[in-house]
């Protein structure tokens, strides 16, 4: 039980990225450009998929939701991080911290399972091409999108309830630039070993489960590709998966580094650097990975620009 003379924490302060003013300017300009590129790339991808009817297939339906999740997850972190760059007191309310943690956790878990849904879609497309339209019906696609959002919501509630039912009565300086779960738990006025163990177990189960779906899908995909007689056929089949594999490798590598490591190797400072990568850089990279390495997206982009140019040219003539 808490003593009456203990102070209940109503707000938290961030240590931020650096205390050097000159470095803050460089970081501010860098991550402002990264955030703008993230919004432009992901929202542009959503609009492109919506406008081009040739992209109205399951693969790009999932990609549009991935772009939405990336834009949202970046917007949960980046605006606050950028606004805190040049203020002495980087403060956030207790409720604001809970909301930021809730939203970011939701989008991260959702992205992991969206990538699993996309892996299953690639498996059906390559391994069962004749049954693709039958298996990947509109109903199934909607279910494969609702599922990740639902899993993200449930897992987020587990983490939020675990973290914010604890008493916070002493230190309120978070060694981070946003409200991440482990740094927040380290400030609780209670033994958090069980909570951290729960985080490790839940993160491990979610990561392993979604990872197994992706791994099994690609094992079957690899077996099918190896059975293709022509080298050109194998290359085309692999090219449809290369963008997805790149996105999966980058995201899962950073998440496992932070959340599924033994506690003996845990370091808040190292996590801060890695978190900076997966909260700001990865959401920016995904649309470029899928567009630069995907002929259909590049062709759709060219068609959209040509169509808009023709419309504007006709308006000028008329």
UniProtKB/Swiss-Prot annotation:
Stretches of the chain forming a coiled coil according to its record: none
Cytoplasmic side: 50-56, 115-144, 220-239, 293-318
Compartments, record wording: Cell membrane
Primary location recorded for the protein, binned into one broad class: membrane
Gene3D superfamilies reported for this sequence: Rhodopsin 7-helix transmembrane proteins
SS bonds (residue pairs): 97-189
Top-level taxon of origin: Eukaryota
Protein family: Belongs to the G-protein coupled receptor 1 family.
Protein name per UniProt: Olfactory receptor 5G26
Organism encoding this protein: Mus musculus (Mouse)
GN (gene name): Or5g26
């Amino acid at each position: 039980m808490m003593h009456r003379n203990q102070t209940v924490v109503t707000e938290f302060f961030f240590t931020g990225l650096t205390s050097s003013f000159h470095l803050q300017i460089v970081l501010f300009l860098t991550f402002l450009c990264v955030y703008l590129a993230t919004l432009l790339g992901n929202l542009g991808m959503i609009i492109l998929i919506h406008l081009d009817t040739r992209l109205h297939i399951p693969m790009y339906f999932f990609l549009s939701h991935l772009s939405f999740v990336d834009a949202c997850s970046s917007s949960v972190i980046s605006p606050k991080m950028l606004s805190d760059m040049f203020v002495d007191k980087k403060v956030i309310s207790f409720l604001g911290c809970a909301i930021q943690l809730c939203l970011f956790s939701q989008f991260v878990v959702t992205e992991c399972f969206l990538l699993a849904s996309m892996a299953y879609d690639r498996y059906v497309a390559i391994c069962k091409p004749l049954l693709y339209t039958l298996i990947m019906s509109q109903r199934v696609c909607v279910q494969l999108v609702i599922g990740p959002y639902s899993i993200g919501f449930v897992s987020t509630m587990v983490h939020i309830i675990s973290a914010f039912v604890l008493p916070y009565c002493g230190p309120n300086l978070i060694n981070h630039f946003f409200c991440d779960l482990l740094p927040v738990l380290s400030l609780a006025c209670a033994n958090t070993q069980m909570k951290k163990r729960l985080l490790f177990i839940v993160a491990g189960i979610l990561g392993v489960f979604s990872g197994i779906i992706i791994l099994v899908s690609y094992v079957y995909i690899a077996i099918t590709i190896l059975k293709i007689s022509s080298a050109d056929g194998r290359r085309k089949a692999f090219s449809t998966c290369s963008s997805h594999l790149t996105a999966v490798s980058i995201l899962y590598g950073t998440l496992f580094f932070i959340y599924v490591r033994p506690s003996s190797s845990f370091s808040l400072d190292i996590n801060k650097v890695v978190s900076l990568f997966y909260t700001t850089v990865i959401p920016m990279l995904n649309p470029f990975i899928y567009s630069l390495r995907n002929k259909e997206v590049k062709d759709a982009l060219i068609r959209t620009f040509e169509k808009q140019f023709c419309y504007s040219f006709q308006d000028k003539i008329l």
